[in-house]
Amino acid sequence: MHQELLLQELLRIHAVIRDAVVAQCEAMALEHMATVSAVEGGDTIYAIDRVSEEVLVREFSQLADQISFRLVAEGLGEDGIRDFPLGVHPAHIQYTIIVDPIDGTRGLMYQKRPAWILTGVAPFASGGNHLHDITLAVMTEIPLVKQHLCDTLWAVQSGGVHAQRRNRLNGTTTTISPSPSQATTILNGFGNIARFFPGARTQLAAVDDYLTTLMLGEAPAGRALSFEDQYISTGGQFYELLMGHDRWLADIRPLLLPPAQRVQQRTMLCCHPYDVCVELIAREAGIVVCKANGSPLDAPLDVHSPVSWVAVANPTLAKRILPALQQALAHHNLALEE
């Protein structure tokens, strides 16, 4: 299948998942959506997740009538892998498709923030695919029940970013143009290190504060020189950068672990490859996405590997933020990735 046709199929599948999840959000009580269904793959699975997973398997089973692929996603068992068509020989698989059917479950199930459907596609490699293999990425907003506009963004490698906005009231779509911030300072802008959950927030906040002080100095009494927005969705964080709302973001939770524990660890809830599978979209928009040491972001396409990442709205600002982040990490005795 030509990549353009595959893109159209993915856009259709995303729309079906989005509409099914929104319908369930309209019909289900908050407490029911937030019921824990299982703990598998790389994260906690809630009742609302099961809705998207059922649609995911159904729709991708239909896609298997046209192409062969390895699907990587939560909800597919402990290894998070299923080959389509069922029983296909690995030698005949064309693509690896990694999906997060609801990125931002916690915010969505309590109707606090939109969630995102994330998909990355790579030509299949028998030895295993990595993030850098992804050549097509799609992200679709799952809106709150009270929200009538929702966005979809996509990118093909070296083809730039494309986006459209859907009006749920009348079904129309309009083209929109993502525009990351071109600011060269973090002063009076949004940006932060992710610290969503109890257990490590003190260290993460200390690194964040140290970095901010390095870049802006001590804030005068009664003033805030920069701001933060802890959006519990990696796709949502990328969206905030893409739309110019945030200037920089980082998720460095794996760096709190000793280096020997940073591979296939299960002791801390971290970002996973399916969470960052659309980073191609950010890079195609000119956003710098990398590791804390400045090297290109990469990870195996699985459901377990912890991922540490930094994203900065433009290269000029990245040249200021990355050295400050590295200095802040060193000050707090946190080792960079190898």
Predicted regions, residues:
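Short, conserved micro-motifs enriched in small and acidic residues
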Residues: L7, D43-V51, M109-K112, I232-G235, ...
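N-terminal subdomain of lithium-sensitive/metallo-dependent phosphomonoesterases centered on the IMPase/IPPase/PAP
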Residues: M1-I102, P315-L317, L322-Q326, A330-E338
